[in-house]
């Protein structure tokens, strides 16, 4: 079964749990990048001596980043990478994990070598928890006396966001340092998108109860997670609305990826694969082989599902106007938030803290 848009966005962007400092609101900076892994298919072509017209898939991935307000810099530590393992596992037989570059012995490099990463943007999302939800409204009923409960740390929604263009990325020791444009743009595409997480304690529960918990969660359209002795079920706050918002995001992300891999600057640098030392003598003068990036299969399928979900969510939408595309595409930034607008946005975020949030199904 194809992954639903809300599930894709959740796995790509959203934290599994909110910070445990009990604040109603929190902020997460997410660095969007393109991962370019080696694949078994690719290496088999190289071994056969086929080094012409080589292609490799690129995949959108997300990383946690830290924000140095004094230097206006995001730093990504090699230990903090979040590629959301499992998102693309079925696409190819990866020769190396997409979060490891054996040639540089670093986990994150921004250069033209393969495997590697290429920067897209830094997305700052503001979240609000204090969600109220009833598990039975989501189809999760008690199982032989074991009850589902709301996980307040794992339930939250997006209230607003900002988008930063990456001006420059440098590799420095254990860090990849990201230099961003001074001013962000408002990013409201995911406002209202949220998830609710329920848990059920299965301490000393018989095997049939555990099996029923998994079946019940998945039949409700949720993501089942098990961390002995507790099972979790993650669901969208409002499936229809969440899928529409997520679909919109995925289609915009697709446009951003396409604009990146077809941009003059990207093509000018050319992605290259360094032949292993034991193969260099077979291809004199071709130690570094050019490789063309193409969008990975899972993401292609996700774009199709997202487009379909937008149509199913209501009337078929007209093509997006240029101004809407620019809301997300960091390569055409022309509307920056002024200091006054940023202050206004912060005031709006603070105002929401006082409101309780009761979930209504639609």
UniProtKB/Swiss-Prot annotation:
Residues 314-323 have a biased composition (Basic and acidic residues). Residues 345-356 have a biased composition (Acidic residues). Residues 314-362 are annotated as: Disordered. This is Uncharacterized protein ORF362.
């Amino acid at each position: 079964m194809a992954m639903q848009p809300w599930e894709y966005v959740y796995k790509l962007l959203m934290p599994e749990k909110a910070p445990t400092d009990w604040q109603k609101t929190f902020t997460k900076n997410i660095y969007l990048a393109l991962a370019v892994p080696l694949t078994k298919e690719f290496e088999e072509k190289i071994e056969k001596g086929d080094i012409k017209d080589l292609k490799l898939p690129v995949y959108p991935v997300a990383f946690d980043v830290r924000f140095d307000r004094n230097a206006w810099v995001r730093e990504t530590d090699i230990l903090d990478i979040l590629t959301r393992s499992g998102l693309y596992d079925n696409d190819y037989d990866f020769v190396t994990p997409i979060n490891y570059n054996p040639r540089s012995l670093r986990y994150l490099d921004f250069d033209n070598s393969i495997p590697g990463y290429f920067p897209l943007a830094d997305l700052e999302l503001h979240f609000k928890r204090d969600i109220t939800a009833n598990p039975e409204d989501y189809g999760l009923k008690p199982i032989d006396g074991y009850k589902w409960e709301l996980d307040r740390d794992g339930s939250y929604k997006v209230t607003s966001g900002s988008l930063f263009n990456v001006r420059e990325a440098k590799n420095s020791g254990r860090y990849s340092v990201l230099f961003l444009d001074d001013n962000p743009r408002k990013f409201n595409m995911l406002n209202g998108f949220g998830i609710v997480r329920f848990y059920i304690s299965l301490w000393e529960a018989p095997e049939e109860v555990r099996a029923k918990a998994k079946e019940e969660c998945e039949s409700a359209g949720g993501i089942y997670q098990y961390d002995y002795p507790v099972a979790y079920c993650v669901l969208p706050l409002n499936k229809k609305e969440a899928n529409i918002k997520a679909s919109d995001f995925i289609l915009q992300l697709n446009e951003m990826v396409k604009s990146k891999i077809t941009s003059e600057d990207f093509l000018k640098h050319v992605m290259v694969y360094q032949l292993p030392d034991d193969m260099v003598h077979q291809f004199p003068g071709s130690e570094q082989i050019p490789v063309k990036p193409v969008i990975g299969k899972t993401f292609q399928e996700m774009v199709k599902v997202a487009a379909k979900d937008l149509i199913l969510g209501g009337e078929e939408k007209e093509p997006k106007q240029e101004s809407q595309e620019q809301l997300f595409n960091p390569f055409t930034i022309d509307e920056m938030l002024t200091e006054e607008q940023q202050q206004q946005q912060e005031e709006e975020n603070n105002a929401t803290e006082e409101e309780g949030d009761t979930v209504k199904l639609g």
